Amino acid sequence: MTSPLNMWTARTDVLETTYGQAGPQNGWPIILLHGFPYDIHAYTEVVPILADAGARVVVPYLRGFGPTRFRFADTPRSGQQAALGRDVIGLLDALQLDSAVLAGFDWGGLSACVAAALWPDRVAGLVSLAGYDIIDVDRLRHPFAPSLEQALWYQHLFQTERGRECLANDRRELCRLLWQQ
């Protein structure tokens, strides 16, 4: 098996993206994009397999996660899907990659799908699991079935100051509750 991830930081127009990398520098590039509430460690077991197969594996912390930071204090903080897709393309630019395979789940899957839809020439392949794919924003204006609304309770909470405080004050307990459902 190859060695664990080497950590780096890539500077884009908006972010200083911290990422792990494994495999040969000249290998076929694959970007692994994590979801919430996970981080790059969600890919611990798959990274060595891909690296041993000759891939240049890049695993970034998405915006709002880990040590990835906005470069400027006045940059609007956004979770809009276009911004997430642009983050992926910004990382490809910073790494001087013409294209890469994108693989992600949850928010990472959304980021990958948006990047593939808006910049198809930059995406050599796409794998998205348990993600939101591309969100029909207009559809979000209407209620879902009550059982789905119940399952998505945390998304409503996170839209409020109360939710921000809940996440800041007791992140572990909140994540434990999410994993139990």
Range-by-range predicted roles:
Residues 12-16:
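Glycine-centered tight beta-turn/hairpin loop motif at sheet-sheet or coil-to-beta transitions
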Residues 18-73:
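Conserved HGGG/HGGXW glycine-rich cap/lid loop of the alpha/beta-hydrolase fold
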